[in-house]
């Protein structure tokens, strides 16, 4: 197995849905199914924060979501937890700057997909040199979902990464909605990652479909 090609990775990032049980006000499996029907291209399991599942409940829930993703041939990525990703044979893992370092993650994960959150050019270059397949750049807009976020960068921060010669696939993160998706893509992102724009939408299907349309229109 070889590492994922850049073109394929770029396409997978178009509509990147991130979710845990505590991000939904209704059945998370129903939300994910609607989102998959609507056109989610990659999914990240992020079970963190107040009211999140732990232990066996967390593992069982992850497996249920993974099974659903597999039915749609949509990659299932685990946030932070490399051991869980290995246990589940997930398609990949996403790590932040405060999580396990990219070098040891790449050693453990082999050729699986690895995404890294990057806030500076230095972080981005280090991640790429040590095996990141894509970067999560942000927060682009203010967000209420993640409490521990860095300073908001705006689309200028994203454009700056491209201006500095960062060519790997990038997904925009933080406060992204249907209304501001076009600006994120036009600034240089290959796709948008969202939590509440889908998880709290009246119709996860409609919200995902509109996000997908905006991305494709703006690329």
From Swiss-Prot:
Q: Which domain of life is it from?
A: Bacteria
* Reaction catalyzed: 2-[(2R,5Z)-2-carboxy-4-methylthiazol-5(2H)-ylidene]ethyl phosphate + 4-amino-2-methyl-5-(diphosphooxymethyl)pyrimidine + 2 H(+) = thiamine phosphate + CO2 + diphosphate; 2-(2-carboxy-4-methylthiazol-5-yl)ethyl phosphate + 4-amino-2-methyl-5-(diphosphooxymethyl)pyrimidine + 2 H(+) = thiamine phosphate + CO2 + diphosphate; 4-methyl-5-(2-phosphooxyethyl)-thiazole + 4-amino-2-methyl-5-(diphosphooxymethyl)pyrimidine + H(+) = thiamine phosphate + diphosphate
Question: Which Gene3D superfamilies does the UniProt entry name for this protein?
Answer: Aldolase class I
Q: How is the cofactor bound?
A: Binds 1 Mg(2+) ion per subunit.
**Tagged with keyword Magnesium:** yes
Q: Supply one GO molecular-function term.
A: magnesium ion binding
**Pathway of action:** Cofactor biosynthesis; thiamine diphosphate biosynthesis; thiamine phosphate from 4-amino-2-methyl-5-diphosphomethylpyrimidine and 4-methyl-5-(2-phosphoethyl)-thiazole: step 1/1
- The UniProt record gives the binding positions of Mg(2+) as 80, 99
Q: What EC designation does it have?
A: 2.5.1.3
Residues recorded as binding 2-[(2R,5Z)-2-carboxy-4-methylthiazol-5(2H)-ylidene]ethyl phosphate, renumbered to this chain, are: 143-145, 175, 195-196
Instruction: Establish whether keyword Magnesium is in the entry.
Output: yes
CDD domains xref list:
TMP_TenI (cd00564)
Q: Which keywords does this Swiss-Prot/TrEMBL entry list?
A: Magnesium, Metal-binding, Thiamine biosynthesis, Transferase
Which terms under GO biological process does the entry name? thiamine biosynthetic process; thiamine diphosphate biosynthetic process
Which EC main class describes this enzyme?
transferase
> Which InterPro entries does the UniProt entry name for this protein?
Aldolase_TIM (IPR013785), ThiamineP_synth_sf (IPR036206), ThiamineP_synth_TenI (IPR022998), TMP_synthase (IPR034291)
Query: Which co-factors does it depend on?
Result: Mg(2+)
| Function field | Condenses 4-methyl-5-(beta-hydroxyethyl)thiazole monophosphate (THZ-P) and 2-methyl-4-amino-5-hydroxymethyl pyrimidine pyrophosphate (HMP-PP) to form thiamine monophosphate (TMP).
- PANTHER family, per database record: THIAMINE-PHOSPHATE PYROPHOSPHORYLASE, THIAMINE-PHOSPHATE SYNTHASE
By sequence similarity, the record places it as follows: Belongs to the thiamine-phosphate synthase family.
- By what name is this protein known? Thiamine-phosphate synthase
Specify the species.
Bacillus cereus (strain ATCC 14579 / DSM 31 / CCUG 7414 / JCM 2152 / NBRC 15305 / NCIMB 9373 / NCTC 2599 / NRRL B-3711)
This protein's gene is called: thiE
């Amino acid at each position: 197995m070889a590492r994922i090609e850049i073109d394929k990775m770029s396409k997978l990032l178009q509509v990147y849905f991130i979710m845990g049980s505590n991000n939904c006000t209704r059945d998370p499996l129903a939300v994910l199914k609607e989102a998959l029907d609507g056109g989610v291209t990659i999914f990240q399991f992020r079970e963190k924060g107040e009211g999140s599942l732990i232990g066996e409940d967390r593992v069982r829930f992850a497996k249920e979501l993974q099974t659903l993703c597999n039915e749609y041939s949509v990659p299932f990525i685990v946030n932070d937890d490399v051991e869980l990703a290995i246990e589940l044979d997930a398609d990949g893992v996403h790590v932040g700057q405060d999580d396990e370092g990219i070098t040891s993650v790449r050693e453990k994960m082999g050729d699986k997909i690895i995404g890294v959150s990057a806030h500076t050019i230095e972080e981005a270059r280090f991640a790429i040199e040590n095996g990141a397949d894509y970067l999560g750049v942000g927060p682009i807009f203010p967000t209420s979902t993640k409490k521990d976020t860095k300073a908001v960068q705006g689309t200028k921060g994203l454009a700056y990464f491209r201006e500095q010669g960062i060519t790997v696939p990038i997904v925009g993160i933080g406060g992204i909605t249907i209304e501001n998706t076009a600006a994120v893509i036009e600034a240089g992102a290959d796709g948008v990652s969202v939590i509440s724009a889908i998880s709290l939408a009246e119709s996860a299907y409609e919200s995902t479909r509109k996000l997908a349309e905006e991305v494709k229109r703006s690329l």
